[in-house]
Amino acid sequence: VGTNQLKSFQFLAEEFNKKNAAGVKFEIIGIDNKLSPQETTSALRSAMDQGARYVVQGNGSGPALAIIDALEKHNARNPGKEVLFLNYAAVDPDLTNSKCSYWHFRLDADTSMKMEALTTYMKDLPEVKKVYLINQNYSHGHQVSKFAKEIMKRKRPDVQFVGDDLHPLAQVRDFAPYIAKIKASGADSVITGNWGSDLALLIKAANDAGLNNVNFYTYYGSVSGSPTAMGAAAAGRVYMVAYAHMNLPGPLNQIVVDYKKKFNDDMYTGAVYHAFSMLTEAFAKTKSTDPVKVAATLEGMKFKSFNGEVEMRKTDHQLQQGLFVSKWEKTGGKYTIDSENTGHTFVPVKYYEPYVASTPTSCQMKRPS
């Protein structure tokens, strides 16, 4: 997943270097944080030693929090050398609530926002009666479970939660025992925030067990490995809630096509595009690449992106954006770009305007004087 996203940043840097409103040149430094908060802190030091004033990270809210903590200290102690953090995929709501920071801007929709959109879709499906939760045992997985129960109770109090499993992150090799529990529970739907091998192997186990009467509602169905695991067997029964899908019209379309040609891989992290378009617009407005000036410009900024008009909310630096619920189907019609050469893709079934998924914030932002 991380390798794919590094390539996405490098590829889009090349694209934006060809032409951008600010006339700046982007250079990407890739450092492996090994999914560890400790490694992240030393990776951040290394990036800053190499002169980076903007850092991007996304996989894991633990590492994201490590960056926020380190930058709060670094920026306070080193005026004139401030560093800005663009978070493209770490979705723990705390990062823009109790742990919010002036130096952190989130480009993905957080766990609670995605659950608002997903449950708005699910509440209107009469066949959804019994839901099973399976998630990774760390902050993100805990949040998916918590918000699923809280928000569904508000919208469809009759829905029963018949299972709530947490498993170690990226360690389970065989999900058959979990699938057996799902089968035994009588669930008609599974909600999971799993990503990477934890989603790919979960879906594979469901296919192997012939679990054909259960729909899976995912956050990360399009991410590396999962499309291949789903294949034709999962068509029509896996859904995804996300700010994008593979077949968006507009500026992202050609980029996705060109990326696939170049790498024989999918560019599924659209927030990388958000990052470049938002920064170039802010650089052009401020006529500067100084993170202090740019941060002030980003607050409350509205810009057109691939999923409509988006806004970087000033109170907590959480991007307000439209979300799609899409369904794993055979490619065809308007939806010709497939995932991982499977001949299948996530086809949008519903688009929700930003207000539907918007959630309040408890952020008490400390702004630099």
Regions from the language model: what does each represent?
Residues 1-10, 31-37, 59-60, 134-143, ...:
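Extracytoplasmic "Venus flytrap"
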Residues 2-22, 147-154:
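Short, polar/charged alpha-helical segment
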Residues 3-7, 19-95, 107, 167-175, ...:
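Beta-alpha junction/loop-to-helix N-cap segments that form part of ligand/metal-binding clefts
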Residues 22, 284-297:
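Short, charged, surface-exposed loops that flank catalytic or proteolytic processing sites
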Residues 38-42, 94, 102-209, 244-254:
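Extracellular/periplasmic Venus flytrap/periplasmic-binding protein
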Residues 47-61, 78-88, 130-135, 186-196, ...:
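Periplasmic-binding protein-like
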Residues 101, 203-275, 281-289, 338-368:
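Extracellular/periplasmic periplasmic-binding protein-like sensory domains
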Residues 302, 306-369:
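Solvent-exposed, acidic/polar segments of extracytosolic/periplasmic ligand-binding ectodomains
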